[in-house]
Regions:
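Nucleotide-activated chemistry modules centered on ATP-dependent adenylation/adenylyltransferase
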Residues: 1-184
Length: 184
C-alpha cells in the first residue's frame, strides 16, 4: 500500500516537478495549498487558478484550507520591515509547514513534504529544518527534498510554460512584493 503524502504547495509552478515525481515514486500524493500568505486576494485567485490547471494535469486532489490572510498577518506583521529571506520568511515557512503537518496528522497522512525547496531564492536548510520539526511535532514523517537540484527550478519554469501556468514575480506576501519593487 503506498504511503499517503501531503505535499505543501507554495504555488503551481513550483509544484510542476515535485508533484509528478512523488507520484511516480509510488506515493499517494495530495496537494495542500495554504495560500493565506499571498496578497492581495486577486493574486491568491490567480495562483489558485494556476493550481487548478496543474491539478487536472497531474490528476490529483488539493486541500484548500481557506484564505485567511488575517491569521498570517497576525504572525508575520511584526517582521514587516525585515528583508526578503529574513525572520519574516522563517515565520511564514513555519506557519505554512505547521498547518500542513497538522492537517496531515489529523487526516491520516503518513508523511508531509513541500515544494518550497525548488526556489533558488529560498533557504532550503531552514525549510527542511522547520519541516522536520513540525512533522515530528504532529507525528508524521518529513520527506526532505531539495527540488532545485538537477536543474529543478529550470525544469519547473519550462513545465510551467508548457502547461500555460501563471508565473508570479514575487514570493507571495505584500512585503515580498514591496521588496521586489512592485509596491511603493
Amino acid at each position: 500500500m503506498p504511503k499517503k503524502l501531503l505535499l505543501h504547495i507554495c504555488c503551481a509552478p513550483d509544484a510542476t516537478i515535485p508533484w509528478p515525481e512523488f507520484t511516480a515514486e509510488g506515493f499517494e500524493t495530495t496537494g495542500y495549498f495554504y495560500g493565506s500568505n499571498i496578497h492581495p486576494e486577486e493574486e491568491y485567485k490567480k495562483r489558485l487558478e494556476a493550481l487548478n490547471i496543474l491539478k487536472a494535469f497531474v490528476r490529483a486532489s488539493v486541500v484548500l484550507p481557506g484564505y485567511e490572510p488575517s491569521a498570517w498577518f497576525s504572525r508575520a506583521e511584526q517582521f514587516a520591515k525585515e528583508p526578503e529571506g529574513g525572520k519574516r520568511c522563517e515565520v511564514c515557512f513555519r506557519t505554512q509547514l505547521e498547518a500542513a503537518a497538522r492537517y496531515a496528522a489529523e487526516n491520516g497522512f503518513d508523511a508531509v513534504s513541500t515544494t518550497l525547496t525548488i526556489s533558488p531564492h529560498k533557504n532550503v536548510a531552514l525549510i527542511n529544518k522547520i519541516g522536520a520539526e513540525t512533522a515530528k511535532k504532529y507525528g508524521v514523517e518529513w520527506i526532505e527534498r531539495i527540488w532545485r537540484k538537477n536543474n529543478g527550478f529550470k525544469r519547473s519554469v519550462e513545465e510551467s510554460r508548457r502547461l500555460g501556468l501563471y508565473r508570479q514575480n514575487y514570493c507571495g506576501c505584500i512585503y515580498s512584493r514591496r521588496d521586489e519593487g512592485e509596491e511603493q
